[in-house]
């Protein structure tokens, strides 16, 4: 509110904001793809049991060398219900009589088969090595593949709980730097994990630091930016991760061994860690947390970088006068209880938490299971990211013209419809199913950007990170619950996707329980969220008319 006047004085979108936003966007572009990294590093290739007569070069039982690979496969591996080689069982003894049967007959009694006691043979045409091939996470151990995703999401969940409160107490920049250090170390160490348990433990620690990085980078952009540029920032926030996803798809194509891909994606984070020393702490946060001297120092630094010649005129008296109400409020330390102190803020927290839960179940449910949509995960990820960038380009125009609520309604509804169409399209129409799923995932990033922007605009600065942490608690609950919905596929193959699509459509209409925030100033205190903020918003709308009349 009154901080906006100070921001205008030092430059609301100058050289400082551009450099800081570019850095934080690049940081998002390199961190976010790690959330779905296991689409590549944990890809499940086609596989079958290892059998001596087929895979041991020294074997020559019964003159098998004169038989083709297809014949050897036929007598060694039983067929499943789709007449494809079984992935998890083999014949206990070669079934020579099958060579004389028509290919449509595959009646083999259960006692003639056994599990893959000698291991598996993997199709390495897409990836030379993944954690699945390294630790044999297939057949009876296939559930462990979900454990890797679950461990990362649990880390994300816990990180979301603790990050908000720490950010409001210790500052955006400090928590961001600490989290980035932890993320860089753990994700680099993942590449050298000697066992599955250590791998999951490191992924848990990495997940623990993701939410503090994303939340605080968004807050540092938000709290240094004028409201009229927030829609542009939301679009850029949607584009940045997808540029990262496109790069990760390209790197996955170049580095087919998961250790190398993991290192290539993780080591550059240390470079960004070094650059965080030049980040500026949020002056808005410093002032409203009763640190006006430090806030003034940051404002003067920004004014100097933006080339504002009157930066020396900015004094402590001006800051205290402009932010008098906020400084008075800052004398009392905000607590978690303050989130529910007023009925309006309480309602917003509850609605946003409810929405975020269903939102993340649907978003992550689709994002981390892309391999179910296509065998060529690299190409699919690249196409989805390219589409998401194109969709994000129109984001600012849509947000500026029709606002946050209508944009969110349209995007989430379309996303849910695309998912449901993909579900009910016949299996034979695979191309259409992939197109629908690609469209659904393509608009997901803009949905995330709009959701984060609208959420931050509804919360006061003094409690923003804490509130985002509470909302993130429910959101991250959805993130680790989303893989569990895939267990429903054992009862009905399309059931998980029906839930993902239905949640998206349901979530779209709950946005009308929240107010529109287009062209409105950010609230700085809980007082601004109440009726006084509504009056100030009304006054802001009337100001231009008053000025024109006086002129």
From Swiss-Prot:
Its main location: membrane. Residues 37-145, 195-203, 256-258, 370-376, 427-432, 489-494 are extracellular. The keyword Oxidoreductase does not apply. Keywords: Cell membrane, Glycoprotein, Membrane, Transmembrane, Transmembrane helix, Transport. SUPFAM superfamilies: MFS general substrate transporter. It is found in: Cell membrane. One of its GO terms (cellular component) is plasma membrane. Residues 525-545 have a biased composition (Basic and acidic residues). InterPro entries: MFS_dom, MFS_sugar_transport-like, MFS_trans_sf. Glycans are attached at residues 39, 56, 62, 102, 107. Residues 523-551 are annotated as: Disordered. Belongs to the major facilitator (TC 2.A.1) superfamily. Organic cation transporter (TC 2.A.1.19) family. PANTHER family: SOLUTE CARRIER FAMILY 22 MEMBER. This is Solute carrier family 22 member 27.
